[in-house]
């Protein structure tokens, strides 16, 4: 894993730990409450973010088997990553990609269970990324549903901006 990717992962984990610490103080009734019928509860936002990261990791696991077919990342991948970042920082609303919205959310039994699942998922991602050959970090290895092919660093940047958006 490259030092830049390691720093991105460390920041993602620190941000997650801070959020989970804050939410742990809230009663269950607050975490399931929706401000309006079309808005998501805190639990639903957490599930959406987890599902998004899990789907991205599944894609990367599959695609990492074909390293020789991946294109070397260049200006276009950097531009796509920038566009994803700018778009997510804008006030525009987007439909969630299939498999990351309310249609797949499940009832949350406890905050501890949900937070434990997300932390475990992050640990698995860190382990997986640490086992990848260094050359993959220079390739267009990840396909964002709207933004197209990005590097792994671009994927982690998406995770950060997506997390901040919600």
What is each stretch, according to the model?
Residues 6-13, 46, 50, 112-119, ...:
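Short amphipathic alpha-helical segments with heptad-repeat character
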Residues 1-7, 58-116:
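Short, helix-capping/interhelical loops that line the mouth of catalytic, cofactor-
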Residues 1-39:
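An N-terminal domain-cap segment
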Residues 32-87, 123, 127-166:
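Short, contiguous alpha-helical
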Residues 21-31, 93-100, 135-143:
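Short alpha-helical hairpin
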Residues 4-7, 11, 18, 78, ...:
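Exposed alpha-helical structural elements
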Residues 16-19, 56, 118, 122-125:
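Hydrophobic alpha-helical core bundles mediating ligand binding, dimerization, or RNAP-core interactions
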């Amino acid at each position: 894993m490259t030092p830049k990717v390691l720093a991105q992962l460390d920041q993602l984990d620190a941000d997650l730990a801070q959020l989970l610490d804050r939410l742990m103080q809230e009663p269950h009734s607050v975490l399931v409450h929706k401000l309006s019928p079309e808005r998501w509860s805190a639990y639903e936002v957490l599930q959406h973010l987890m599902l998004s990261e899990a789907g991205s990791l599944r894609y990367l696991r599959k695609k990492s088997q074909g390293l020789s077919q991946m294109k070397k990342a260049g200006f276009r991948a950097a531009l796509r990553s920038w566009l994803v970042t700018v778009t997510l920082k804008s006030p525009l609303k987007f439909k969630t990609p299939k498999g990351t919205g309310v249609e797949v959310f499940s009832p949350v039994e406890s905050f501890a269970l949900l937070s434990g699942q997300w932390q475990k998922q992050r640990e698995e991602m860190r382990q997986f990324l640490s086992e990848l050959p260094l050359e993959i970090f220079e390739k267009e290895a990840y396909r964002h549903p709207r933004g197209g092919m990005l590097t792994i660093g671009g994927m982690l940047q998406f995770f950060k901006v997506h997390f901040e958006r919600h």
